[in-house]
Every structure is written in structure tokens, then in C-alpha cells.
């Protein structure tokens, strides 16, 4: 599923559109959408739109960046929570990527009992996702996966982690 946000960006750029506005337009104007299977809770498009807009605002979306720097935006609906992330990155002359900052805005509804724990959970999720993005690779030889355990599966290192992961929780019911 990590490929989906990239496809949104590719489609937006091919259409000459801003990736944020492209996503907002795709969400449409409805406030809720019923579940596709007829069961479960409806999808609250308004809440998704709100986290996207808030993440963009807090990350300075649309403000100029120096040469070699850029921003990307993505959103996710998971476990009845609405999450938007903006990553600010630098690409060196050698083509090496460094994630400078990630801004996350989430609407999980309800009261957060342990704010520090919730922030740490989101920050850990960002680190895990970046590790998957930067290092995840399974090699297959002779029809079998070469890596036999996590010891052979590289994880992100502290030096590769962004120095800033800003987490913001929207107050909703």
C-alpha cells in the first residue's frame, strides 16, 4: 500500500496539479461515505480533508524551499483513525535522500488518555515506515526468500531518522 501515495503524486504531477489540492479534489465534497461492504462505520471524508489541510498548514505546504529540498504529502485511514503526513526531504548532489522533518496530523476521535504515549506511537510508526521505505527488500533465489530472520533484514538507523517528527492530534468527538 506504500505505492499508492506515490501514484497520487505521479498523477498530480502529470496533470500539472498540486499534490495536496489533487487529493482534496479526489475526496470530493461529501462529508461521509457509507462503508463499501454495507457493514461497519462510514468513512468521514470531512475528517480526512481536515487532517490533510491541517498537516499542510503546519508543515508550510506551498512555501518555497531551497534547491534540492522538497515536500511530499500522504494520508491514511486506519483503525478508524484519519492520518496525514508531510515529509520534508533533501536530495544531495549524489542523489542521496535525507528526511529532514515529518509533520503528522491525526484525528483518532475521542479522548487521548496518555498524550506522550500516543505521540511516541505515531513517531515510532513514522520511523518504521521510513525503514520499510528505505531498506525493505526481500531477495528470492530458487523460489525461496533468502533472508531467514529479522537479523538479515536491515532496519533504519538513528542517523537516517528525521531529526524532527512533529505530531498533532485534532480534537474531535
Kindly give the residue locations of the regions a language model identified.
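C-terminal catalytic domains of large/alpha subunits in multi-subunit enzymes
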Residues: 2-80, 90-173
Amino acid at each position: 500500500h506504500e505505492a499508492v501515495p506515490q501514484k497520487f503524486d505521479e498523477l498530480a504531477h502529470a496533470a500539472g496539479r498540486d499534490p495536496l489540492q489533487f487529493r482534496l479534489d479526489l475526496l470530493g465534497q461529501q462529508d461521509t461515505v457509507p462503508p463499501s461492504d454495507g457493514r461497519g462505520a462510514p468513512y468521514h471524508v470531512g475528517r480526512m480533508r481536515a487532517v490533510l489541510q491541517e498537516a499542510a498548514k503546519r508543515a508550510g505546504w506551498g512555501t518555497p524551499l531551497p534547491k534540492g529540498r522538497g515536500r511530499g504529502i500522504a494520508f491514511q485511514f486506519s483503525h478508524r483513525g484519519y492520518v496525514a503526513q508531510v515529509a520534508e526531504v533533501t536530495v544531495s548532489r549524489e542523489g542521496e535522500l535525507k528526511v529532514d522533518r515529518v509533520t503528522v496530523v491525526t484525528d483518532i476521535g475521542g479522548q487521548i488518555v496518555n498524550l506522550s504515549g500516543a505521540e511516541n506511537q505515531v513517531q515510532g510508526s513514522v520511523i518504521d515506515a521510513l525503514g520499510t521505505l528505505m531498506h525493505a527488500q526481500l531477495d528470492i533465489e530458487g523460489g525461496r526468500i533468502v533472508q531467514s530472520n529479522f537479523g538479515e533484514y536491515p532496519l533504519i538507523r538513528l542517523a537516517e531518522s528525521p531529526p524532527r517528527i512533529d505530531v498533532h492530534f485534532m480534537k474531535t468527538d
